[in-house]
Amino acid sequence: MSRRNAPKKRPISSDPIYRSRLVSMVISHILKNGKKSLAHRILYQAMKNIEEKTEKDPLKILQQAVLNATPLVEVKARRIGGSTYQVPREVKPERGTALALRWLLSSARKRPGRDMASKLTNELLDAANEVGNAIRKREETHRMAEANKAFSHYRF
């Protein structure tokens, strides 16, 4: 790891259709092998599907899904005196959002089905309703932090 200064955060530009930074972040997380136009198509199709199914603003549902999947605490391994402890720590907002997006997309990819747009639609709707694999992952992370609360004095 570099001992120099931490790199500056690049500003995330908002997407052209929804004018939202969150949508741009989701597109960047969907991205595989540099095919950004495909990532755009997948997300916009998923948003259209959400609007057809719920007749609500898809951006609000996306925001709710990400908010519900965002963890507040996580555990980090810390080696002390020959044994490794799982030390709970708070999650910064940027990291929480990144984790939520990662979990939502990995859960969507694992779902059965043909196209990614429909799988992403179902995962986002489930997460907005506080069910689904991404929510389960967040709950599991919170349980781990709660179980290892005794080691919280080993700060980083």
Swiss-Prot record:
Q: Name one GO biological process term.
A: translation
User: Where is this protein localized, as stated in its record?
Assistant: Plastid, Chloroplast
Top-level division of the source organism's lineage: Eukaryota
Keyword check for Ribonucleoprotein, yes or no.
Answer: yes
Which of UniProt's keywords are assigned here? Answer: Chloroplast, Plastid, Ribonucleoprotein, Ribosomal protein, RNA-binding, rRNA-binding
| Transmembrane feature ranges | none
Q: Which GO terms describe its cellular component?
A: chloroplast; small ribosomal subunit
| UniProt keyword Plastid, yes or no | yes
InterPro entries per the record?
A: Ribosomal_uS7, Ribosomal_uS7_bac/org-type, Ribosomal_uS7_CS, Ribosomal_uS7_dom, Ribosomal_uS7_dom_sf
Q: Which terms does the record give in the GO molecular function aspect?
A: rRNA binding; structural constituent of ribosome
**Which PANTHER family does this UniProt record tie to the protein?**
RIBOSOMAL PROTEIN S7 (PTHR11205)
Say which family it is in: Belongs to the universal ribosomal protein uS7 family.
Q: What task does this protein carry out?
A: One of the primary rRNA binding proteins, it binds directly to 16S rRNA where it nucleates assembly of the head domain of the 30S subunit.
Looking up NCBIfam families in the UniProt record yields: rpsG_bact
Q: How does it assemble?
A: Part of the 30S ribosomal subunit.
Designated name of the protein: Small ribosomal subunit protein uS7c
Q: Which organism's genome codes for this protein?
A: Chlorokybus atmophyticus (Soil alga)
Recorded name of the encoding gene: rps7
